Each structure stands twice: as structure tokens, then as C-alpha cells.
Amino acid sequence: MELKIDTHSHTYASGHAYSTLIENARSAKENGLAMFCTTDHAESMPGAPHYWFFANQRVLPRFLEGVAILRGVEANILNTEGEIDLPLSVDPNLDWAIASFHEPVFAPSNKEAHTQALLNVIQGGRIDALGHLGNPHFDFDFHAVLHCAKEHNVAIEINNSTLKGHSRVGSVERCYEIARVGKALGVYFTTGSDAHFCQDVGKLDLASELLDSVGIDSHRVITHSPSQFLDFLELRGRGPIDELASLRQ
């Protein structure tokens, strides 16, 4: 499947990534993207930036190297109440918000606790996608969470880095099963490289392979085209981004 948007990438601001935004944009261009989301870790992760970093993304240009930039965050799920580590005041300055479990922030617990946290973060209405759900340390009720995501128009991320099998070990088959459940329920899918070095931005080959293998319709993959992605943002209640209107053509 052709994928034109990468919705999960990091700069050195995350504390354990190694490239600048401009370097990421250059790689995005080289890898054929139309746009990408910059989504550094929110402040509860060791080494991550203060929330002012995210609030100030309004100063970023809408295009670098001819590639559109979406202003985003990878927020941490903090607890079973589904709270995330970003003040509400930052939300208007963002185009895209992922919520993910990370072991240094949310200690792995049990299936019921993880499920409740995910349901609550979806229902909280602040996040657009759930990140790298395949991690076996954070088992959850696939059907309950994906059904809730479908009802609230929250996208399910297919994470290319996870599918390499080197991080979050044990995730790959779970990612395929999550995709199969999501297909049956009709959820929206997004795709992210989870790049921590610039050369990986836009490398979504394993995510594409999974989507094709499971038989996901491209109409349910919001990263298949810029117009689909921008339509999804508006479905989520985010205002139109005038500078990106030309990408709908």
C-alpha cells in the first residue's frame, strides 16, 4: 500500500533521538513523503522537553524541504484514569497527538488496568491515535479498546519500528492480530516510522506489508493520502490548516 504520511517521528529534543527537524524533513522528502508529523516525547519521559516546547510549535513553518510538517506530540499515558502529561492549554497549538504506554512512566500492570487506561484516554477526547499497541508488556482487551477507538474516531497506529522486532520484543504477531481485529471493527489506521534517527523518517515498508497482508482497505488508512489525513483531522474536530489546502488536490 502506498503511504504518503508518517505520523510518528522524533528529534533530538526527545532526549534519546539523534536528528534535527530539518534533517528529518530532508529524509522525509528523500523517502517520498508528502507530509510528516513531528511527535517528540512529552515531559514525563526521561530527557523529554518541557511542555513549552510543544506549545511553541506554532513558530514552525508549514513546509520544510517541500514536505508539510504537522505539529504533534507523543504523550504518555500516566494512569488508569487515562490522564496524559500535557496541559490542556497546549492542545490548540497541536495538529496531532499520539498517546502511548512507556515503561518508565506507566509501570506494566495487568490486562484490566491497561484496558481501562486506554478506554479512558480515548474517551478523554484529547488524542488522535494510540501508539505502538503491540507491546506484550501492556496487554489489553483488543476488542473493547478498538471498538471504543472506532466509536470515537481515534486511529490505531501500525508502528514500523515495532515490526522490525528489535524493540518491544514479542509485539509483531500482536500487531497483526490488532490489525485483524481493527479491520473487522472498521477502525481507522495510521502508520508511523517511530524514527529516532532521520534516515528512518518515511520508512514504512513493514507497516505497508502488514496492511496488505491483513487486507486493510486503503480508505481506512489515513496515511494513504494527504487528503485522507486532513479529512481525518477535521473529523476529529481539528480546524482546517489553510496552508495545506493545496495537498488535497
Swiss-Prot record:
One GO CC annotation: cytosol
Residues the record lists as binding Zn(2+) 2: H16, H41, H196
Alphabetized InterPro entries for the sequence: Phosphatase_YcdX_put (IPR023710), PHP_dom (IPR004013), PHP_phosphatase (IPR050243), Pol/His_phosphatase_N (IPR003141), Pol/histidinol_Pase-like (IPR016195)
Cofactor: how bound: Binds 3 Zn(2+) ions per subunit.
Cofactor(s) for this UniProt protein: Zn(2+)
Amino-acid positions noted as binding Zn(2+) 3 in the UniProt annotation, renumbered to this chain: E74, H102, H132
One GO term of the biological process aspect: bacterial-type flagellum-dependent swarming motility
Enzyme class (EC, first level): hydrolase
Keywords: Hydrolase, Metal-binding, Zinc
EC number in record: 3.1.3.-
GO molecular function: phosphatase activity; zinc ion binding
Pfam families reported in the protein's UniProt record: PHP
Binding site for Zn(2+) 1: H8, H10, E74, D194
Family: Belongs to the PHP family.
Record's protein name: Probable phosphatase VVA0289
Lineage, highest ranks first: Bacteria, Pseudomonadati, Pseudomonadota, Gammaproteobacteria, Vibrionales
